[in-house]
């Protein structure tokens, strides 16, 4: 018999200490990694539920195990909410991650060796969009497209590459691009050569759900996303589509299970269902609008302080600061800001002279600080502190002074009150 009062603290002090230290770190550090966010206690309640015990290979109503009548309800709720939120007529909530959702699309629609057009990682793409170290770059013939001198997607070059290489699939989406993608233009290019348009909206799904960023679902053959990041749910993946054939949807389902995964994580799917319901609330739209406002406010300060921002601004939740002219590396900036309790990630910038392990830039995102309650005034103040650190990157007194300010504002704006 398992006693409900069993706990980690009494049983595994070493593990519990690390967990508690991470809790403190999250409360005492300002989180600016664009792919990170704080999920609600309701989502964590779902993830810590007894649903974790249940195997449920298959799909609602078509399981390979018995005893699935209640997890069927859970998964169907998540499916229905995903379809409603994004205006889709197909949803698969089983992918364990965004990368596995992307793997599903590749295996459902392509054969190894097929040609794919994907955004260059150095220009803002993602590992799964064709990086040579990833399955996508190893199994498929990847042709990269990128951004122009203004920092925006070069659609003319994309169209030229498409007509020249005749890819079977074009990938839209990004991990470090601060502009608005013209999904209709991408579909037009895909249709002109008979290619699939696959959109990975992992970074902007929350903005899309709130109507703050254009929805790719009506334009793409298939859309994937993570359920964390701007969507603020549990770590996981999601596949969506609209107007496709039953044959396409069967291919996608089969590529998830049994093609790429076994049993779904029902406790995580419950967390997805909660997050999707939360994303339908009016306050979620207000939150996403503030995410975008805060990003613009921070960019304004960086530009005023003489820092170069890729594309000159942002139209979503993130932006890239190019440090080449400052003779700083992303690695140095990341470390110095970290000592001030400000967490960012080093990031390559277009035409970066440094390696991906060093880089010449940092990526800044506002979902997490906005979740704490920051508005434009706090975002601008924070950007100023970051510039202070970067201007005096070797001055530990400056870094310590900013750390004190960070601790103070974190205490005033706790993650979990």
UniProtKB/Swiss-Prot annotation:
Its EC number is 2.1.2.1. GO terms for biological process: glycine biosynthetic process from serine; tetrahydrofolate interconversion. One of its GO terms (cellular component) is cytosol. The modification N6-acetyllysine is found at residues 54, 250, 285, 354, 375. Pathway: One-carbon metabolism; tetrahydrofolate interconversion; Amino-acid biosynthesis; glycine biosynthesis; glycine from L-serine: step 1/1. PROSITE patterns: SHMT. The keyword Membrane does not apply. Its cofactor is pyridoxal 5'-phosphate. It is found in: Cytoplasm. CDD domains: SHMT. Transmembrane segments: none annotated. (6S)-5,6,7,8-tetrahydrofolate binds at residues 121, 125-127, 355-357. The modification N6-(pyridoxal phosphate)lysine is found at residue 229. One of its GO terms (molecular function) is pyridoxal phosphate binding. Keywords: Acetylation, Amino-acid biosynthesis, Cytoplasm, One-carbon metabolism, Pyridoxal phosphate, Transferase. The record marks 228 as: Plays an important role in substrate specificity. InterPro entries: PyrdxlP-dep_Trfase, PyrdxlP-dep_Trfase_major, PyrdxlP-dep_Trfase_small, Ser_HO-MeTrfase, Ser_HO-MeTrfase-like, Ser_HO-MeTrfase_PLP_BS, SHMT-like_dom. The keyword Amino-acid biosynthesis applies. PANTHER family: SERINE HYDROXYMETHYLTRANSFERASE. HAMAP family: SHMT. Catalyzes the reversible interconversion of serine and glycine with tetrahydrofolate (THF) serving as the one-carbon carrier. This reaction serves as the major source of one-carbon groups required for the biosynthesis of purines, thymidylate, methionine, and other important biomolecules. Also exhibits THF-independent aldolase activity toward beta-hydroxyamino acids, producing glycine and aldehydes, via a retro-aldol mechanism. Belongs to the SHMT family. Homodimer. This is Serine hydroxymethyltransferase. It comes from Shigella dysenteriae serotype 1 (strain Sd197). The lineage of its organism: Bacteria, Pseudomonadati, Pseudomonadota, Gammaproteobacteria, Enterobacterales.
């Amino acid at each position: 018999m398992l006693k409900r009062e069993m706990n980690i603290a009494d049983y595994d002090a070493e593990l519990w200490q690390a967990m508690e230290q991470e809790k403190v770190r999250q409360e005492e550090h300002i989180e600016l990694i664009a792919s990170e966010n704080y999920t609600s206690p309701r989502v964590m309640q779902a993830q810590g539920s007894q649903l974790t015990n249940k195997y449920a290979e298959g799909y609602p109503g078509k399981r390979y195990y018995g005893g699935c009548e209640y997890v069927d309800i859970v998964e169907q709720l998540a499916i229905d909410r995903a379809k409603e939120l994004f205006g889709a007529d197909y949803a698969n909530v089983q992918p364990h991650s965004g990368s596995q959702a992307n793997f599903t699309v590749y295996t459902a629609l392509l054969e190894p060796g097929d040609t794919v057009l994907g955004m260059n990682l150095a220009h803002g793409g993602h590992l799964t969009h064709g990086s040579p170290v990833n399955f996508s770059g190893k199994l498929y013939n990847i042709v990269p497209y990128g951004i122009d001198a203004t920092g925006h997607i070069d659609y003319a070059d994309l169209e030229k590459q498409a007509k020249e290489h005749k890819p079977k699939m074009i990938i839209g989406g990004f991990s470090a691009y601060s502009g608005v993608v013209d999904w209709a233009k991408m579909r037009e290019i895909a249709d002109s050569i008979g290619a699939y348009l696959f959109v990975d909206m992992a970074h902007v799904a929350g903005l899309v759900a709130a109507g703050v960023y254009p929805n790719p679902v009506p334009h793409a053959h298939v859309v994937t996303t993570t359920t964390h990041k701007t969507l603020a749910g549990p770590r996981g993946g999601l596949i969506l589509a609209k107007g496709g054939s039953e044959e396409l949807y069967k291919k996608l389902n089969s590529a998830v299970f049994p093609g790429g995964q076994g049993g779904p994580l029902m406790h995580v799917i419950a967390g997805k269902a909660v997050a999707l319901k939360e994303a339908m609330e009016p306050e979620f739209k207000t939150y996403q609008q503030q995410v975008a406002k805060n990003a613009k406010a921070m960019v304004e300060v960086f530009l005023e302080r003489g820092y170069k921002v890729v594309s000159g601004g942002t139209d979503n939740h993130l932006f890239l600061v190019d440090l080449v002219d400052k003779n700083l590396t992303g690695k140095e900036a990341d470390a110095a800001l970290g000592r001030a309790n400000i967490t960012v990630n080093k990031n390559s910038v277009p035409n970066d002279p440094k390696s991906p392990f060093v880089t010449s830039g940092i990526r800044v995102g506002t979902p997490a600080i906005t979740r704490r309650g920051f508005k434009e005034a706090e975002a601008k103040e924070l950007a100023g502190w970051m510039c202070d650190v970067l201007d005096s990157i070797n001055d530990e007194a400056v870094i310590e002074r900013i750390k004190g300010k960070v601790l103070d504002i974190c205490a005033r704006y706790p993650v979990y009150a």
